[in-house]
Curated annotation (Swiss-Prot):
The lineage of its organism: Archaea, Methanobacteriati, Methanobacteriota, Stenosarchaea group, Methanomicrobia. The active site is at 8 (nucleophile). This is Phosphoglycolate phosphatase. It catalyses: 2-phosphoglycolate + H2O = glycolate + phosphate. Belongs to the archaeal SPP-like hydrolase family.
Amino acid sequence: MLRGVITDIDGTLTDEKRRLSTAAIETIRKLQEGGIEVVLSSGNTSCLLKGLCKLIGTGGTFIGENGGVYRIGFQGSMQVMANRDIAVKALNLLEEYYGKKGIRLELYSHQERYSDIAFAREVPVEEVRSLLSGWPVDIMDTNFAIHIHEAGIDKGRTFHIVAEQLGIKPDEFLGIGDSENDIGMIKAAGTGCCVANAQEDVRNISDYCSSVPYGEGFVEIMRMYFPHILAR
């Protein structure tokens, strides 16, 4: 029996302009009120996720920075899963390389990140991976940003820790997302789903893909798996 939902945000709870879907928010509130633990899981910062948990209406548990940080409930302390130093050193190499080409990397929320580096998708991600080949880092393309973090960190690994601390088995969760950074999380959940705008590799490992994209697709899937709550 499903007791929880772990969901990506950008591209999953939003529309094509990255605006939060009000239908998705209302659905999450109904799930939470119906006894389903909803966990937000994102590549974004803990600062943003703390606010979103409160404003959307979850129980306060989140995974941020693609698994690099997490918090259990509103009263929990934020935990950091990775050493950011190696990501910063990798960034220094990239800035030197691209600087010689007259390209300046646009960093995202640099001062608010504890475990990773994120920057705009203005350079080819495969080139970044090639430049950092042999480094103990992982490069993640979320469709919204390129992320660098210590090797071995991802949403799926941290999800196992979060599930244990919540007292809910991973196979009692429905996982849903749209990008490559969601694959580990979707695989770790008992039921894995994606929205219609998902990348092909995400669609290939999902149990079900919605017929409509973005937040409306999220709502479709939640209604399919939780009719006893959302039919009210």
